């Protein structure tokens, strides 16, 4: 089935707020096999909203609205949809009671216009708003499904997760929809697609949807079946075929992230980590410490941006800095080995390179070296040639650091 997301609010058109709801909803709908081909943003204007609805009805089975459910005159989503589907608006007593209780609890005066927020389309399924006042609703009418949700993300997102997701699963095909995301790193989107192109070309059930983001590639596999176990089996069969071809670049599923996976392995193996950061300037250490309980494995780090710090704190020989340079395999090796010794950790990882925008030491932006010293094993240096802005190069360098750390730990 196809859905269209219609965001209502003049503030969106003026650029006063960002439409994060569309991103959230698109991701959620994709995970249950509902296609989203159009995002529409319309201001607080009845005529233009009517036009947007009629256009959407021609190209989508499911129309999802965010915003315009509040108490003011310019909150007109419900009234406009009611006029189009020819349904009355009626008070939902549970919502009205909840709104009155909110005003009593906060000591604010309950004005008549606030009753408007409890109006719902007659015959609709009402979605309770556990984080605000205006309820949402879902109506199946004239072979279309109309979903109305509040605009504030803190209200809309939990409402979707608790009520809309099961509602949509029930009114679509009656089939179980099972989705799994495979995450890859160290391979480009085009390279990965070439290796699995025949599977993509011949996809039926499950479907395969590639997506590239920040140096990573994901494949979303979505299967439909009356039996949930059979839907999962369909996913597993295609996943096996994919990993036979590109398994060396695979690192996790769904909401797994490289830094989480690497830290999990560190904890599992009981190793400690220290880092020496030049071009990344603390980005790696920052991501490490985003993980709760990481003090058990992370000793700390040295931001060795200036050569004096490399030489006097991390004992990189002056000769190495003068001949090979700070941006070199030799320097990365010294940094990884010596930060490990300095902070008495099992593993030392180092980052040195040119973030740009200008060249340095006659080396182009994107020239990067990552050093990895693990216990008594020979130190490994990974050379990289990255592209992008200064910030993109730094962020991608950090991801490569976690990737190489994860892969090396996985081997041990």
From Swiss-Prot:
Cited InterPro entries: CinA (IPR050101), CinA-like_C (IPR036653), CinA_C (IPR008136), CinA_KH (IPR041424), Competence-induced_CinA (IPR008135), MoaB/Mog-like_dom_sf (IPR036425), MoaB/Mog_dom (IPR001453)
Protein family according to the UniProt entry: Belongs to the CinA family.
Protein name: Putative competence-damage inducible protein
Gene: cinA
């Amino acid at each position: 089935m196809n859905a269209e997301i219609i965001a209502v609010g003049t503030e969106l058109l003026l650029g006063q707020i960002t439409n994060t709801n569309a991103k959230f909803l698109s991701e959620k709908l994709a995970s249950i096999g509902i296609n989203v081909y159009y995002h529409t943003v319309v201001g607080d204007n009845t005529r233009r909203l009517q036009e947007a609805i009629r256009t959407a009805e021609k190209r989508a089975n499911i129309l999802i609205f965010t915003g315009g459910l509040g108490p003011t005159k310019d909150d007109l989503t419900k009234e406009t949809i009611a006029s189009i589907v020819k349904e009355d608006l009626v008070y939902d007593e549970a919502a009205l009671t909840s709104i009155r209780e909110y005003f009593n609890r906060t000591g604010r005066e309950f004005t008549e216009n606030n009753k408007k927020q409890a109006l719902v389309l007659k015959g609709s399924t009402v979605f309770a708003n556990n984080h605000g006042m205006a309820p949402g609703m879902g109506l199946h009418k004239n072979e279309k499904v109309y979903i109305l949700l509040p605009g504030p993300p803190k209200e809309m997102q939990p409402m979707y997760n608790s009520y809309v997701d099961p509602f949509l699963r029930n009114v679509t095909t009656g089939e179980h929809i099972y989705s799994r995301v495979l995450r890859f790193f160290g391979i480009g989107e085009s390279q990965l697609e070439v290796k699995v192109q025949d599977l993509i070309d011949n996809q039926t059930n499950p479907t395969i949807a590639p997506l590239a983001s920040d140096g990573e590639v994901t494949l979303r596999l979505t299967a439909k079946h009356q039996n949930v176990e059979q839907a999962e089996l369909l996913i597993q069969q295609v996943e096996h075929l994919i990993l036979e071809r590109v398994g060396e670049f695979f690192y996790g599923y769904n909401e797994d992230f490289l830094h989480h996976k690497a830290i999990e392995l560190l904890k599992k193996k009981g190793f400690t980590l220290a880092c020496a950061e030049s071009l990344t300037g603390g980005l790696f250490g920052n991501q490490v410490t985003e993980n709760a309980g990481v003090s058990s494995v992370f000793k700390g780090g040295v931001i060795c941006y200036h050569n004096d710090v490399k030489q006097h704190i991390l004992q990189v020989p002056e000769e190495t800095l003068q001949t090979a340079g700070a941006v070199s395999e030799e320097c990365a090796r010294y940094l990884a080995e010596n930060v490990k010794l300095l902070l008495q950790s099992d593993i030392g990882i180092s980052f040195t390179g040119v973030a740009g925008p200008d060249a340095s030491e006659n080396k182009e932006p994107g020239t990067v070296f990552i050093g990895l010293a693990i216990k008594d094993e020979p130190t490994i240096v990974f050379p990289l040639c990255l592209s992008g802005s200064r910030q993109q190069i730094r962020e991608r360098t950090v991801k490569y650091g976690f990737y190489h750390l994860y892969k090396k730990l996985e081997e041990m």
